[in-house]
Structures are given as C-alpha cells and as structure tokens.
Amino acid sequence: GAGKTTLMQALAGFRKPYRGKVKLAKGQRLCMLPQNARSLFVADTVEKELLDSAGQDQAKAMQMAEKLELTPLLARHPYDLSGGEIQRLAVGKLLLREATVLLLDEPTKGLDAYAKAELAQLLRALCQDGTSILIVTHDVEFAARYATRCALMFDGLLLSEGEPHDFFAG
C-alpha cells in the first residue's frame, strides 16, 4: 500500500520511524482504533468493556454508555453488536482513556450508510468538544463529506492535501 497504516502506527508509537521523530504537544493523549475494532474487546459484555477502560469507575463508564447510546446494549457481548455499535463501543473505550487525539484506521469499513452517518455524527461532536481525529480511509465519499482536511498518500509520500472542496475539485 501507500503506507497509511504504517504512518498511523508510527504516530501511535507502535512502529519506530526510519527517519524523523513523532512529537505530540504536551498534555495530548493519543489512542488508535485499528482496522479490526473487535481486536480491542476482551470482556464478555459491553458494560465490562467500558468499565475496564474507565478504570472500574462505574459512573464514568455509564456516562460514556449514555453519551454513545450504548445503554440498551450493556449486557450484550461485544461480538454480537452491529458494525456501527462496534465502532461506537471502540471509540467509547478510547475516550474513556481520555484520548485527546484519535487515530482511526478504516473506521467505515463494513458499515452501512446509516452506521456511517451515525459514526460521522459522533466524530463531529468529538471534534466540537476538542478531540483531534486523524482518519485513514479508502472511503472517498465519507472523507469528502465529513473531513475538514484531506490528504493523498502514494508510495509512502504525502502528494496532496487541502480542504475537501478544493481537494476533490481538481
């Protein structure tokens, strides 16, 4: 590929760059959502997943469940959720770790149009609350519609970047 996932892994600290350095501004907390969000799940219920990420703080976990409309799903196994519900739970787990920067690798993969719109609404709200979000995607329509900036990578190089309107216009 172009190196998108490798770049994201370097930003997250999972890989060491061959050249250069990755630095975060002081106080920033970065978390990454992998392509397979299910790989984050180890507990047998949605509630336990949230509690684990909240450091067993019941109030904090339930507040996140309410915010992400996961309350009706608390007793369900994470693997029994729909694609959109899985993404919401995964993002909730990252936010409970007090992430200020989210790296999302192919977050729309396998989602239907409704789940994509739901995810976009959540991401927009997070941005308004001050969370920075970097998304790697092949979903050009999603990027054009919801991103504030877009970039094109090819063979490990950043070839172009700009606001979606300008980026996709020419």
Q: Where do the PLM segments sit?
A:
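Conserved ABC ATPase signature
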Residues: 77-81, 85
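ABC-family nucleotide-binding domains
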Residues: 112
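H-loop/switch region of ABC-family ATPase nucleotide-binding domains
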Residues: 137-138
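Conserved beta-strand-loop-alpha-helix hinge in the C-terminal portion
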Residues: 157-170
